[in-house]
Structures are given as structure tokens and as C-alpha cells.
Amino acid sequence: MDIEFVRSRFIKHFDGKTGNIYASPGRINLIGEHTDYNGGFVFPGAVDKGIMAELRPNGTNTIMCYSIDLKDRVEFKVDDPKGPRASWARYIYGVVQEMRKLGVDVKGFNTAFAGDVPLGAGMSSSAALESCFAFALNDLFGDNKVSKWDMVLAGQATEHNYCGVNCGIMDQFASVFGKEGCLMRLDCRSREFEYFPFKPVGYKLVLLNSCVKHELAGSPYNDRRNSCENVVKHIAAKHPEGKFETLRDCTWEQLEEVKAEVGEEDYKRAHFVLGEKDRVLAVCEALNAGDYETVGKKMYETHEGLSKEYEVSCEELDFLNDIAKENGVTGSRIMGGGFGGCTINLVKEELYDAFIADAKAKYSAKYGKEPKVIDVVISDGSRKIC
């Protein structure tokens, strides 16, 4: 993101004066999919694409916002009980209200912002926007007294209370806590986390966006969550002495005990979740050892599980995964909820050009459009630029 680009738009729209510039990143998740609501681990990292915003207090009770990308301007009062209608502005409004709840005395300000997080790629542009403004308001009006975790929760509460999205905490967490050259293992239950080195010399990390999103009948995500909860319920009934909140608390042996009772579909879904828990821990060991071949192997295993057991893949994503295998890509898998979106690929630099060319050619020949190529580098989280 270009600082001068954002600054020039800010100056143009707000009296020719400059303010402070802040940035927050989007994110990837290397491994640990559909584990958050099962009490497991996720493995995100902040990336070199995000949101950049310039802010300056304006001495009033009015917040004036300009979206550079949308060329849209919205203003609202700090204490407006309803907030703006524009969906993009509600993220800023929500963060303002949540930071006020945390004791930050937010006053009126002018802001212009832009982003280079590709929309529809599952890289959490909304979390980047929330994190950017939470960080900025904490700096401008809160004397930086609000903790990073409270900023994460303010972003999550913004989604819940003002934008109608019942999200977890991974996206905001990655945007706020991101660290250059490191991925983070986050325990979704305890919120404990640990940094792991991710410096794959000789490799590139690239997303291939299938540019499809399949709308399925019913509630596919709720169905899978219900499957997992059903398995836990059956295991808990067999082991009344234990404490079983989620599949995180269950063993392979206990899953096998209830296989006949829960049915094949629920069994397969629970089998994936337990396997994913083990894969995340294996990736932790591999990263500490600098063993990226094992990391890649586990990525392929996750894709296989998401496709065949959890059944959240689609023809296009499986096709991209097959192309990765054919081209000797070290690791490839679905990233995100599934039914469309991206694959995330760990590929050796010497194979990169041939892989991308082959993926574009074959995907275009089969589906009539090229996948979008998104190169990413693991980068720092929310920060003040100047």
C-alpha cells in the first residue's frame, strides 16, 4: 500500500492538512480449518496486504469518512445511536462505539482509507479495517491504554453488533498480533498463542482464487457444526466421568467407540477435526525444525480431509489442488470455509512460474476464466506508520 497515495487523497478531501497514518493487514491461515468452533487450534499469519488509513481529529463531534476505493463519503456523529447505513461505514462506526465502551473518549475526526486485500479471497479485509481503526483510535484518543486483546475483541464485537456477522476471533487476532516472519498458533478456547518461525527460504506462498462461490441449499456450516456436537454428545454419554465440551476433548479411541451410533457422515466430519488437531501440532514441530516438506505434506492431508471427510471442497478447488500436485508444489489446500474461494500453496521458487502458468492455462481451459494469483509475504500486524 502506497503511503503517498492515501495521503494525497486525504489532503484533497480534508482541508489540505495531514494526519497520522495507520495500517493493519489481512491474513492467511496455513492450517487448522473448521477447528475454531471445535475448540481447537488455528495457525494464521498477517500478510503484506491490508488497510491503510489517515486520521486527524477535527475538533467537532462528527466523524467524516472517505473510502478511497469506493469513492464514497459518509459522516456521522460520535454518539449517533443508529449509525450510518453504508455497510463499509458501519465497520468504522462499530469500532468507535466499541472503543468508547472500553473507556476511549473518541472525538470527531476526519479519515480517508484504502485497501489492497483482494475481496472474496477469504483474507479478512473487514478485520483489517476494524483493527486499523481500533489501533488508530487507541493512539489518538486512548493514550494507547487499550490492550491488544481488547482491540481484537472490539473488532469481533463490531462484526457481531453492527454488521450482522457472527465471526470468531482469528481474523482480528491475526491482524493485530501479526509479526513479520512468524505464524501464530492460536488456541481458540484459552486464547493462548505462540509465535512460530515462518521463513521459507527458497519457497513462495501464493493463493489461487478459484473465483467461484457455490451457494448451497440449507446451512452447510451449521450442519457440520451440528455433526461435531452430536459426536461429542454421544462420547460424553459413554463417559459421564469426563468433561467433553468440544471435539478438542475427545480421543481417537472415543470416536471409534461411537462410530456405529453417530452414523457415517458425522463420524467422517469428527474424524477430520481430530486429524486436523494432530496436523496443526505436527506443523508446529516442522516449522521449529525448518522442515517445510513436512509442512507441505500436512497441507495436502488437510485438503484431502476437507474434500473427502468434511466435504467442504468443490470441483474447482480440487482441480487446483490436483494441478499443484502435478507441478510438484510442496503443499496446497483449501483456505477458508470452503465451497469456493482460494487454495493456499507453498511452492519452491524454481517451480513457481511453471506452476502458475499451468494453473492459469488448465483452469481457463476447463472453467473459462483464470484463477487470480495472490502472492503473500508474512508481515507485521497493526501499526502506526507516521
Regions found by a protein language model. Name each.
Residues 1-27, 52-85, 182-331, 346-386:
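C-terminal nucleotide
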Residues 1-22, 28-32, 37-41, 76-79, ...:
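Gly/Ser-rich oxyanion-binding loop with an adjacent helix/lid
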Residues 39-46, 224-225:
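Short Gly/aromatic-enriched secondary-structure transition segments
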Residues 44-46, 54-57, 103:
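Short, charge-rich binding segments
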Residues 111-113, 208-210, 343:
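A structural signal for short, well-ordered beta-strand segments
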Residues 128, 342-346:
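FabD-like malonyl-/acyl-CoA
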Residues 339:
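Glycine-rich phosphate-binding loop
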